[in-house]
Regions:
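N-terminal secretory signal peptides and thylakoid transit peptides that target proteins
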Residues: 2-22
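N-terminal maturation segment of proteins
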Residues: 29-611
Length: 611
């Protein structure tokens, strides 16, 4: 890890001293061999080569300091030329990773090598496609560089406000430097959107409409100063940092950011006149090829669209079979499971108040559910992390195109907490029976919790992730909450959990339906409403998300099923020696991996337990 290694060692030492957690004694952190040291030095070099393209990630991880201090004033370069440079770097570093002899390596180091090989191979396949964004080792592969839930216009304002910390005048100067680069990154993406148009790629009209609404709101905010100015003004005032920060930020926002947003609006307005309403990749040039790759990237498997579609229908039937008796016990006896879940969703006992009163209720409700689940964690894991968590509302201008919530871990050193972002555009999006499950998925023991373990791994492992693992773990986290009793006195909450799993089974059906079976957008929405009792307003945004992130929705249930399959295998192999806490440690300490590597990690856990 070169310059990064001392920082991580200090962080781990501080963690161990302050919390007395058994992290460093884990097999995942066993003493490295000489061969490991050589391999890890190469992997550290590969990590640094990747990180230099993503200075925003360095800030989010809290490692934009010392040798990387210049990154603190930089944004990710979103130009087409830089995409080519990333691909060139991946090709060279994949060759280096492939040349490592894994025979003499420890299991943990061998896992890191396999992770790099898998992530880089898949990313390079994506870069060979004629369009789209290919975030390396990430979950947001998309054919559309700017759309309702993708683009610098969304990412950078949120990043500047929530990830770029301001404690000194130098931090404020770095904020302004990044803000000054924002227009260039908008133009870089506008140029790539134009190039995609020349290749025949036009997003569906209904997605462009959403994107234009949000872009127009962003442009209006920039012309007025808005959040880009308020963020630095508020935080420099709170820290008593003298300077004309607000005036400088306002000049950039009004004179540079707003015109760049207007240029992006003009391009998408042009494309709106050419757009159709076909939602799936089947309607796009090279769309079938793109979708096959997107499924592989999301699931880390070679399952076909038809296979995934059928898995979704089978798992949905099984989950509805578990929901039916609970619904009957609550007095909901008439109609399909989906119809009865719709009725449950209208039950006033489970609704939040409208408006700001209900928004406050939701935030308090989440905090209470986090408190409850924290008491269960020592029963689930031998190795614990802090679970550094902040619950925040999504920026209102982002909410119309966003899902109900999302979350992720904070910085390596803990200075930036993990975030649970909740969409509160209307309190009708959430109920008291489904919000606990959402909290377990996004926060603890889901994304925020798992991400903290990943932050203790070598840097390359922190940078690379796989949707099937990330989302599969988050679903497994929901399952653990149920298995450890959080719904024992709350049957409606258990229904919310099962509905959440069924929702992910529906995703397998709808995603493949849209992109492979030529479903309409309306068919996708109706499937969720009819089969799972989902709220039409919520799933309309969900279906739009599947249209802009093809394949991404399939990683969830495929990953969850794989984690349970490996658990069943470990139980059968170990018998009385099987321990749920040890199994959970093996999965989460093994880090974010493709599903075939997960199986190897579980095999290693079984072998160690038998020894």
């Amino acid at each position: 890890m070169t310059a990064f290694e001392l920082t991580r060692r200090d962080a781990l030492a501080g963690l161990a001293a302050s919390t007395a957690l058994p992290f460093l004694s884990s097999p995942a952190f066993a003493q490295a061999t000489a061969a490991d040291a050589q391999a890890n030095a190469l992997l550290d070099s590969i990590a640094e080569n990747l990180l230099r393209f993503y200075p925003q990630t360095a800030t989010s991880l809290g490692i934009d300091k010392d040798a990387r201090a210049a990154m603190r004033a930089q944004l990710d370069d979103r130009s087409g030329l830089t995409q080519q440079r990333i691909a060139q770097t991946l090709r060279a570093d994949l060759a280096r990773a492939n040349a490592i002899d894994v025979a003499g390596l420890s299991h943990s180091t061998r896992t890191s090598v396999e992770v790099v090989r898998s992530a880089y191979t898949t990313a390079l396949e994506g870069f060979r496609l004629p369009y789209g964004d290919v975030p390396v080792g990430s979950w947001r592969n998309t054919p559309y560089v700017v759309i309702q839930n993708v683009g610098a216009y969304l990412d950078i304002p949120r990043f500047l406000d929530s990830e770029h910390q301001i404690a000194t005048a130098a931090d404020a100067e770095a904020y302004l430097a990044r803000l000054a680069d924002f227009p260039q990154q908008l133009d870089n993406e506008t140029g790539r959107v134009m190039m995609a148009r020349y290749k025949g790629l036009i997003p569906p009209a209904f997605l462009i409409d959403k994107a234009l609404t949000q872009l127009q709101a962003s442009a209006k905010s920039a012309r007025e100063g808005g959040g880009l100015v308020e963020s630095i003004e508020r935080r420099t005032r709170e820290k008593n940092i003298p300077g004309n920060w607000a005036a400088r930020a306002r000049a950039i926002a009004q004179k540079e950011v707003a015109p760049a947003l207007e240029r992006q609006i003009a391009e998408l307005t042009l494309q709106r006149g050419m757009a159709k309403n076909d939602p799936g990749m089947w309607a796009q040039p090279s769309g079938d090829e793109y979708y096959r790759w997107a499924l592989k990237a999301s699931t880390t498997t070679t399952l076909s669209p038809d296979e995934i579609h059928n898995i979704g229908r089978e798992e949905l039937r099984a989950l509805q079979g578990r929901m039916d008796p609970i619904l009957r016990s609550l007095g909901y006896t008439n109609g399909t499971v989906g119809e009865r879940m719709q009725a449950l969703g209208k039950d006033s006992r489970y609704k939040f108040a409208p408006g700001d009163k209900g928004r406050a209720e939701i935030m308090a409700f989440i905090q209470e559910r986090v408190r409850i689940i924290r008491t269960k964690l020592p029963q689930m894991f031998n190795t614990l992390v802090k679970g550094n968590l902040e619950v925040r509302r999504l920026p209102p201008e982002e909410e119309p195109g966003a899902p109900g919530a999302y979350g992720g871990a904070g910085s390596i050193d803990g200075t930036i907490p993990g975030k649970f972002w909740i969409n509160l555009r209307t309190t009708e999006l959430h109920t008291k029976f489904d919000l606990p499950d959402l909290t377990h998925h996004e926060a603890i023991p889901g994304h925020v919790w798992q991400g903290e373990y990943a932050n203790k791994l070598p840097l390359i492992r922190t940078l690379l992730s796989f949707g099937a693992y990330s989302e599969g773990w988050a679903l497994y986290a929901q399952q653990l909450a149920d298995e450890f009793g959080v719904y024992d006195d709350f049957p409606a909450g258990r229904l919310g959990y099962l509905q959440g799993l069924a929702f992910r089974a529906c995703r397998l059906v709808v995603d493949t339906g849209l992109h492979s079976k030529r479903w309409t957008r309306e068919q996708g929405v109706r499937f969720f409403v009819d089969e799972n009792g989902s709220k039409a307003e919520e799933v309309a945004s969900e279906v739009d998300r599947y249209c802009s992130w093809p394949g991404q929705a399939c990683g969830y249930k495929i990953g969850h099923t794989a984690i349970n399959r490996e658990r069943d295998k470990a139980k059968a192999a170990l018998g009385a020696r099987y321990d749920i806490k040890a199994y959970n440690d093996a999965v989460v300490l093994g880090g974010n991996v493709p599903m075939d590597v997960l199986a190897k990690n579980v095999d290693d856990y079984v072998a160690r337990t038998r020894a």
